[in-house]
């Protein structure tokens, strides 16, 4: 991502997926030999590669065991349940897809099926009844490694934190706006929580990081505010997606990546400059078969809406959409800021309409936005 190249003094061309080559190429730097460096990885796979490289080079950082502990969703669920033993989250591991109907019935409906070591939401399904479980089973390999767990009902937060020598600093959180099924329509902030709930969220995040041995570096934790209290969805030894870190930067002036670099390298923290009262992210997806014609003018129109900070496609322009997006992937993103929550929502709605409108549709202003959701319990 562009923000992790800002201020770079030297570039080293290497293949970070090739561990021996990465260690060899980076190990030639004088700063690495002197212990005045650190390898960073901010993606699902790059996080583990960076941890392995730091250990091989004798550099500080989150240990590989902590990264893998957060990646193992079954072990993470078992650990996090110790933080609320009176009301744990029900779950079961599944090694054969044919057992899914039995295990989902055992857990109860609705429930969630997810790969034990998956990433970016791929392979995650919400199952509402036995028929849906029967239909889901053929979608996975016969011999598999899945997790079946109860569906957590309530508002969801994405929490960004930064750890240093075992001290976990909560940098901020965004509210996840639910879309159809388990998808997200976007995120926004600020999120008003009462002091007791906010404290419980912080305690859960810090407890999870302690239990997995995550002592240094950024983390991203997904939390649902259930009627029984905050419950963990997943946690990762890396920042959230680039658009989420940009949200915190826009609204709070909190630069998650710059803070991670500063903490890892022992540098002064960047100056915090809050920029907006409200900031929001909206995902836009197109139906299969849609040709993204005239993408350039429609992007320009969306960017021209007052308050829009960024509008971009994540698929090539002038192509035909072959399938609906899966997991956490989306066809387009919008970022905006505003003085009020109502103005933010209106800004994102207007920009989404301009971006998503089919040029063959003669009816101007036809809504193409994700369905509006209630606040679902936020103050």
Give the label of every model feature segment.
Residues 1-66, 315-320, 326-329, 339-367, ...:
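ATP-binding N-terminal substructure of ATP-dependent carboxylate-amine bond-forming enzymes
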Residues 10-17, 90-96, 125-128:
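Short acidic-hydrophobic, aromatic-tinged amphipathic segments that line or gate anion-handling sites
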Residues 28-36, 105-108, 141-143, 212:
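Glycine-rich phosphate-binding loop signature in dinucleotide/nucleotide-binding domains
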Residues 55-123:
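A conserved helix-loop-beta module that forms one wall/lid of the active-site cleft
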Residues 82, 261-379:
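Peripheral (often C-terminal) accessory segments that flank ATP-dependent C-N-forming ligase machineries
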Residues 124-230:
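Internal nucleotide-binding/catalytic subdomain
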Residues 125, 150, 193, 249, ...:
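Short, well-ordered beta-strand elements within core beta-sheets of diverse protein domains
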Residues 199-221, 227, 236-294:
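Active-site "cap" helix and flanking loop/linker of ATP-utilizing ligase/carboxylase catalytic domains
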């Amino acid at each position: 991502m562009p923000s992790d190249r800002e201020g770079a003094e030297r570039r080293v061309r290497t293949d970070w997926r090739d561990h021996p080559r990465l260690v060899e190429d980076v190990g030639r730097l004088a700063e690495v030999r002197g212990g005045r460096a650190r390898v960073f990885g901010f993606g699902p796979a790059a996080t583990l590669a960076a941890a392995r490289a730091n250990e091989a080079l004798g550099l500080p950082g989150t240990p590989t065991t902590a990264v893998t502990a957060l990646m193992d969703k079954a072990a993470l669920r078992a650990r996090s349940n110790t933080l609320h033993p009176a009301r744990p989250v029900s779950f079961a591991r599944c090694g054969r897809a044919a057992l899914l109907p039995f295990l989902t019935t055992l857990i109860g409906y609705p429930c969630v099926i997810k790969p034990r070591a998956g990433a970016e939401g791929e392979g995650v399904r919400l199952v509402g009844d036995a028929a849906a479980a029967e239909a889901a089973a053929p979608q996975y390999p016969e011999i598999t490694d899945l997790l079946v767990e109860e569906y957590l009902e309530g508002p969801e937060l994405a929490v960004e934190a930064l750890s240093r020598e075992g001290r976990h600093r909560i940098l901020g959180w965004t509210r996840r706006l639910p879309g159809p099924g388990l998808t997200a329509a976007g995120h926004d902030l600020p999120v008003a929580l009462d002091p007791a709930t906010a404290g419980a969220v912080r305690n859960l995040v810090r407890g999870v990081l302690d239990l997995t041995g995550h002592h240094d570096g950024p983390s991203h934790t997904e939390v649902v505010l259930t009627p029984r209290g905050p419950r963990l969805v997943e946690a990762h030894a890396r920042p959230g997606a680039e658009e989420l870190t940009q949200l915190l930067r826009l609204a709070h002036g909190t630069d998650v990546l710059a803070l991670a670099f500063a903490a890892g390298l022992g540098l002064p923290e960047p100056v915090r400059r809050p920029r907006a009262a409200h900031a929001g992210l909206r995902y836009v997806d197109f139906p299969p078969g849609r040709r993204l014609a005239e993408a350039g003018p429609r992007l320009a129109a969306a960017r021209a809406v007052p308050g829009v900070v960024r509008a971009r496609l994540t698929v090539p322009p002038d192509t035909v959409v072959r399938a609906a997006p899966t997991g956490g992937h989306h066809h387009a993103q919008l970022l905006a800021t505003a003085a009020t929550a109502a103005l933010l929502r209106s800004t994102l709605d207007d920009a989404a309409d301009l971006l998503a409108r089919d040029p063959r549709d003669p009816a101007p202003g036809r809504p193409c936005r994700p369905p509006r959701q209630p606040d679902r319990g936020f103050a």
